[in-house]
Amino acid sequence: MYIAVPNILHVKYTRAALEAGRHVIVEKPMAPTAALAEELAELARSKKLFLFEAVTTQYQDNYAKIREVLPKVGAVTMVQCNFSQYSSRYHDFCAGKVWPSFDPACAGGALMDLGVYNVSYVVGLFGSPNKVHYAANITRGIDTSGVLTMEYRSFKAVSINAKDSSSPARYIIQGTKGYLLQKSTANFCGGVTFHPYKGKEEHFNLSAGRPRQAAEFHAFARAIESEDMELCSRMLDTSVAVSRVLETARRDAGIRFATDL
């Protein structure tokens, strides 16, 4: 079952589907809090059902290639992510009409809508950060844009997400031997170039010509058909970790949802 409803309803419908014995693919973000994400993950495991969060980033061929070539950059020192996309609904929001994507009652906002891709990108490569800080532009209780900082033991990751403005997408992983540059948003995960400080540049684009959601749904189908619960469990762990970063970040910025305890 594929669940694509406003963010605040993801948990309700996912829980109901799992209780009914259905495998579930739920749109990102899986849940508005880490506790609720953990609840869904444990429910799926207890019933031996597949539960996947539909976040395209981590299933793209280029993302797998980034993980493969990452050691070439040397010791990672900085990571930059920018997913800024002016929303067609922002004008309505400014005029007082609120769509779910800009409604705190629906668990909306730039972080939950776009930032989730950046966080998934970073956490999927490096695991959970040690510290999180979110400086957001907030209007009527919701973030229309913001800058998220994730601190790791030996490097910092910065994520910009915006629905009130646009900019070119940039994903850069900087290291002591070179850097990886990607000029597309994390949901597409387009071509990547490795720029070594010594030697020739290397470019790869393994996802060219494929629909954006093709890789993830092929992965879901293969996992279910082959009963690959190990993959499902591993991806659920990542989804819970991403949910924890998102929750910590928005709480840090003073953004509250109805599901918060």
Predicted regions and their residues:
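Predominantly a Rossmann-like dinucleotide-binding segment in NAD(P)-dependent oxidoreductases
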Residues: 58-130
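Short strand-turn motif at the edge of the Rossmann-like AdoMet-binding core
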Residues: 28-29, 54-57, 83
